[in-house]
């Protein structure tokens, strides 16, 4: 019985530690973006990461994303997304997440992605940012999108 209790404590403390590390990775990402810390922001991604932005043309390798982001970070202010909530899934060396974010210009957005444990360090290997559209205005937004695509 004592062994079961010790194993349970280890499992729960390990899971808690893992999620604290994972949350710190993403919280740090958003803080680095807010403060315009280019190097620290991109150090959180794996070398073969992919970033999907809100525009249909925005599917970038990490190097392409760096080129896009460099001007935004150059004045010490990247972009600001406040975390509203976050969920984690997966186990082992691969985890995935979804988070609701709030941006002053875009409103509520959703970030989804995958993180991997690489050389004992969690890295973001895939991140997708999407705008959240309330169902009550989805058709109107869809029409605007279709018109913009012409």
Regions found by a protein language model. Name each.
Residues 8-43, 63, 93, 143-150:
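Short, low-complexity N-terminal intrinsically disordered segments enriched in polar/charged residues
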Residues 21-22, 64-108:
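Surface-exposed, charged secondary-structure patches
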Residues 41-42, 49, 65, 97, ...:
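Hydrophobic pocket/interface hotspot
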Residues 49-60, 71-77:
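A short gly/proline-enriched turn/hairpin at secondary-structure junctions
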Residues 1-7:
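Sec-dependent signal peptide recognition
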Residues 45, 55, 85, 99-103, ...:
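A mature extracytoplasmic/lumenal domain signature
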Residues 88-94, 115-123:
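A short, structured loop/turn motif at beta-sheet edges
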Residues 118, 126-150:
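Low-complexity, intrinsically disordered terminal/linker segments enriched in charged
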């Amino acid at each position: 019985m004592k062994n079961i209790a010790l194993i349970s404590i280890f499992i729960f403390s390990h899971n808690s530690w893992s999620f604290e590390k994972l949350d710190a990775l993403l919280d740090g990402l958003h803080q680095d973006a807010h403060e315009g810390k280019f190097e620290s922001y991109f150090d959180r991604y794996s070398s073969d990461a992919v970033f999907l932005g809100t525009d249909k043309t925005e599917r970038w390798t990490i190097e392409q994303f760096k080129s896009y982001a460099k001007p935004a970070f150059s004045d010490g202010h990247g972009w600001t997304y406040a975390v509203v909530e976050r969920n984690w899934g997966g186990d082992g060396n691969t985890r995935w997440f979804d988070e609701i974010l709030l941006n002053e210009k875009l409103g509520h957005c959703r970030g989804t992605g995958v993180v991997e444990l690489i050389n004992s360090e969690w890295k973001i290997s895939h991140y997708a940012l999407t705008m959240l559209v309330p169902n009550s205005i989805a058709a109107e937004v869809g029409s605007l999108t279709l018109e913009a695509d012409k």
